[in-house]
Amino acid sequence: MIKRLLSGLILMVAVNSQARQLQEPPTQIVYRFDDHRYLELKGWDCEGELWFTDTKRGIHSQVWSQFYRIFTKRFVHPSERYIAISAWGGGFTVSKDYGRTWSGAHYSPGENEPDGMNLPPYDDIISFTVVNDQGFLQTKHSLYMSSKPFDDPRLAAGGPGITYTLDDGDVYHIDPRSPGPAWGLDYITKRALKNDIAKYHTNYQNLPDKTPEVKNYTGWDHMRCDMDAGR
């Protein structure tokens, strides 16, 4: 009798699993920036493809091709040209053209954290704010920032580059052919910036000490996802 029940349960699970594979994965809105921009997740159990839509500009683009899981911390994003999306567990995908194209962004190498690590544990993250084309990731111990939204013109093709002198008098030069990360593609703390040559770039100078205040934001302040969607 028990064997029959177990066989029946196994068969039922197999049938349900096969039926779900044949069924189109559910799509749900997991974040709204405002009245015309939003993120959709396509997949079962809140994991799958992530898509961005801007109805005003006619943009519909894929941000993550698979395995995306929502960022669960506070998320405020009024910025339009520069869009930065994080995920559960960390990491960034960013767009610098209103969401038409996407590329990866990273934590800068160096001692961003008090313990010498270059990135925070996910549980230490408090919030992620993207405003005025710049991202600010607040953690328990640090504020990670992307650069100001432009590249140092001295490092453009054909530019003079940047010559700088260290405290010991040694002189170095940053060549335009090896300029380092383009704007918006790495996140760094002031702690790490002290020992990084990026501090000589104009787009890394005079960075704020705290996340700028965001007023009159009409979007969501957290991502949302229904685990039972499609069932």
Enumerate the predicted regions with their spans.
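Hydrophobic h-region of N-terminal signal peptides that target proteins for export
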Residues: S7-Q18
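Sequence/structural signature of beta-propeller modules
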Residues: Q18-T27, P153-R231
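Beta-strand-rich domains and repeat architectures in extracellular enzymes and scaffolds
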Residues: L22-W51
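Repeated scaffold domains used in trafficking and secretory/extracellular systems
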Residues: E24-I29, F67-P78, G110-F128
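Short beta-strand elements that form the blades of beta-propeller/WD-repeat-like
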Residues: D35-G43, S79-G90, P120-M145, H173, ...
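Conserved Ser/Thr-centered positions that define the repeating blades of beta-propeller domains
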Residues: T53, T93-K96, K140, Y144-D152, ...
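Asp-box/BNR beta-propeller loop motif
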Residues: T53-I59, T93-H106
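Beta-propeller fold detector
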Residues: S61-S65, S103-P109, D175
